[in-house]
């Protein structure tokens, strides 16, 4: 089935960086940037200018050269400059050779033939999620893929029908789980087991998750959690939770929307059954771009022991694009799935989407998740240090609800404001040329992305953020 696209294994113990008394100066931030080996990547992205992020017309390059501070990659990543080149190559292919683009490689194009483009993107994506290329399929959108994989992996019985999930999951995940349960004839109020945060905390501890598994294992069919919780930014211990749940007889799936491209993953080595993710956040493939799916190789096997006409394989919702390429165009209505995750594909994927994704992933091919995570470690720790150094312990203006432990988070810090401050503060930040993400109730999610953000960005953000807080206090 091929080899695992390995990244360096992350250490289980991550030491948080410490900073000197001079850390709260512009000169210190600039000195960190000067030593940053990843600063070479910033120029490969288009950073919106402060003027352009406020305009109500198509962006004009001449409006301003002063870049905005863009800390919203956890919602939508910035556009890589190479995307335009790749898209133009696709348009030129379509206009010049039309249908022949499906099967013909062009010598001067950065793209492979359309029929192989999804497979190529899967190979690019595999190292990012720690999987074999055959275990990755690039297809659909995140919630669509979640439905497709739950159709295969959620197999409830009257004795075991529950799904263990997080309390206040991202709404689309909640809807998908609820509808799958209803579709099988069960009551969501009884079958949805929601794990709430620990008392007095916004975090859900691994211990509480394991206790919940113990409590409900005999009646549970599936454990489905996010790799990183979208509101708090908490990174779950995927390896430990997966192994424990499987030891109790549960199938385990993960929504990696906020984890893929953000933190090191080893889905194959961790024995995860299935996972889904989007590519428009940390992978920077564009709004609504095509998504990814992972299926462990043991679930993608096709057994021909009873002959070529009687393949045995795991049940899934079938479509022609999941058929083996050797017989996909025979049109004989005899489904022979492609081995691996590609056998779970349904429809012909959008080449425009694949083109944008392949362009974005070409930058990841120049680095590694190990290198990315090292900068994330330092960049987010610096942001945390500056924020906390000016937040009064007697009467704090905000609270960081993301875990302080760097092994339990990625790039995002979720800043919980006092009630009623969110809209006013967000407007002030936007007016100052800062793009961050607000999430009701009362949270600003700040995500400095290591591929294109700098330590100077972090320093400038904190100065503006503190001034905006002071104005809110005075109002």
Swiss-Prot record:
Catalytic activity, EC: 3.7.1.3
Needed co-factor(s): pyridoxal 5'-phosphate
Chain positions found as N6-(pyridoxal phosphate)lysine: 281
Keywords: Cytoplasm, Hydrolase, Pyridine nucleotide biosynthesis, Pyridoxal phosphate
Molecular-function GO terms, alphabetical: kynureninase activity; pyridoxal phosphate binding
GO biological process: 'de novo' NAD biosynthetic process from L-tryptophan; anthranilate metabolic process; L-kynurenine catabolic process; L-tryptophan catabolic process to kynurenine; quinolinate biosynthetic process
Gene Ontology annotations for the cellular component aspect, listed alphabetically: cytoplasm
Binding site for pyridoxal 5'-phosphate: 142-143, 170-173, 255, 258, 280, 320, 348
Subunit structure: Homodimer.
Family affiliation: Belongs to the kynureninase family.
UniProt name for this protein: Kynureninase
Organism: Botryotinia fuckeliana (strain B05.10)
Lineage, top ranks: Eukaryota, Fungi, Dikarya, Ascomycota, Pezizomycotina
């Amino acid at each position: 089935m091929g080899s695992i696209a390995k990244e360096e294994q992350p250490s289980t113990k991550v030491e948080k960086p410490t900073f000197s008394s001079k850390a709260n100066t512009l000169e210190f931030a600039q000195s960190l940037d000067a030593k940053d080996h990843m600063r070479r990547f910033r120029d490969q992205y288009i950073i919106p200018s402060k003027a352009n992020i406020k305009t109500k017309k198509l962006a004009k390059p001449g409006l301003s050269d002063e870049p905005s501070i863009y800390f919203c990659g956890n919602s939508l990543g910035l556009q890589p400059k190479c995307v335009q080149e790749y898209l133009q190559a696709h348009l030129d292919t379509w206009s010049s050779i039309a249908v022949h683009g499906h099967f013909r490689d062009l010598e001067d194009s950065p793209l492979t033939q359309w029929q192989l483009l999804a497979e190529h993107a899967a190979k690019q994506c595999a190292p990012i999620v720690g999987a074999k290329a055959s275990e990755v399929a690039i297809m659909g959108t995140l919630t669509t893929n979640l439905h497709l994989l739950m159709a295969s992996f959620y197999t409830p019985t009257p004795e075991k029908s529950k799904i263990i999930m997080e309390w206040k999951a991202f709404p689309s995940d909640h809807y998908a789980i609820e509808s799958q349960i209803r579709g099988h004839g069960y009551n969501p109020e009884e079958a949805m087991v929601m794990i709430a945060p620990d008392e007095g905390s916004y975090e859900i501890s691994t211990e509480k998750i394991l206790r919940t598994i113990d409590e409900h294992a005999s009646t549970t069919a599936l454990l489905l959690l996010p790799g990183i919780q979208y509101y708090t930014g908490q990174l779950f211990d995927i390896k430990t939770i997966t192994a424990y749940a499987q030891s109790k007889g549960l199938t385990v799936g993960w929504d990696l929307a906020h984890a893929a491209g953000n933190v090191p993953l080893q889905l194959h080595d961790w024995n995860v059954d299935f996972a889904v993710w989007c590519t428009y956040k940390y992978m920077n493939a564009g709004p609504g771009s095509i998504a990814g799916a992972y299926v462990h190789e043991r679930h993608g096997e096709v057994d021909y022991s009873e002959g070529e006409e009687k393949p045995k394989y795991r049940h899934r919702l079938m479509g022609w694009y999941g058929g083996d390429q050797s017989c996909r165009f025979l049109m004989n209505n005899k489904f022979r799935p492609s081995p691996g995750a590609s056998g779970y594909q349904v429809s012909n994927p959008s080449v425009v989407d694949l083109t944008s994704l392949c362009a974005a992933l070409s930058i990841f091919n120049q680095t590694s998740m190990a290198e990315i995570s090292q900068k994330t470690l330092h960049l987010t720790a610096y942001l945390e240090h500056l924020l906390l150094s000016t937040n009064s312990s007697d009467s704090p203006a905000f609270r960081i609800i993301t875990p302080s432990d760097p092994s339990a988070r990625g790039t995002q810090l979720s800043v919980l404001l006092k009630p009623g401050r969110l809209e006013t503060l967000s407007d002030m930040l936007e007016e100052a040329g800062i793009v961050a993400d607000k999430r009701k109730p009362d949270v600003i999610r700040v995500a400095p992305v290591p591929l294109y953000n700098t330590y100077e960005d972090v320093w400038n953000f904190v100065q503006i953020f503190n001034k905006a807080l002071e104005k809110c206090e005075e109002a």
